[in-house]
Amino acid sequence: MNNIVVFGGTGEVGRIVVEKLLAQGRIVKTLTRNKTSKSSHTNLNLIVGNVLEVSTVEQCIESQDIVIIVLGFNNSSLDTMSRGTANIVSVMLAKKCNRLVCLSAQGVGESWEHMPDSFKTMVLNDPILTASFKDHTLQEQVVKNSNLNWTIVRPTEIVDEIESGGYCVNGYKDNLTFQISKYDVAQFIVDEISNSAYVNKVAMITN
């Protein structure tokens, strides 16, 4: 049975990822900054700390087989995702933990040129979104240069819709929207931990 650590496991998508892993009987660690948090499941180990602290990251990754990163953007620290991911990758290499699944966003990197003009305008006119995409771009560079068995997941706009039970990977069809349920994003991430189809690849997903 794989031991899995989820960074960002208390966020919108992260919580669902953790729930799905626990439902499979997995042993899960997750990091929280809330000192009063308590585990609600016998297979869930909560570590209190910050992803920017290397010692905390070392504690999280100790004896783990798979790392999942679903970090969110932090307005108070504009490079939390990239710096935190750099810490995670460094510790993974030191501890010989090789499998990494990292959540990014559609529009990051080379996918920017394929985005609708309306999307580009929205991002460029919003300083927070602009900073978030910059941080995601740096984060992806860290992952791609890591020599790990990585998968980068780029969802379209994540929405609170119910789980559809399916998703489209690396392509659009006429009947697809530029949105995806957060539950479907979480399911794809969970599916990826036992799937080699997207190792060292970027997977764009949408409904």
What would you call each of these model-derived segments?
Residues E110, S146, I162-Y167, E192-K201:
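Glycine/proline-rich active-site loop of Rossmann-fold NAD(P)-dependent oxidoreductases
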Residues D65-I68, V101:
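N-terminal Rossmann-like NAD(P) cofactor-binding module of classical short-chain dehydrogenase/reductase
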Residues N74-L100, L138:
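NAD(P)-cofactor binding segment of oxidoreductase domains
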Residues E140-E161:
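Conserved beta-loop-beta element that borders a ligand/cofactor-binding pocket
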Residues N45-D65:
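Conserved Rossmann-fold cofactor-binding substructure of NAD(P)-dependent oxidoreductases
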Residues T80, V153, I180-V190, K201:
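Substrate-positioning beta->alpha
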Residues I4-Q24:
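N-terminal Rossmann NAD(P)H-binding glycine-rich loop of SDR-like oxidoreductase domains
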Residues L31-T36, N50-V51:
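N-terminal Rossmann-fold cofactor-binding loop
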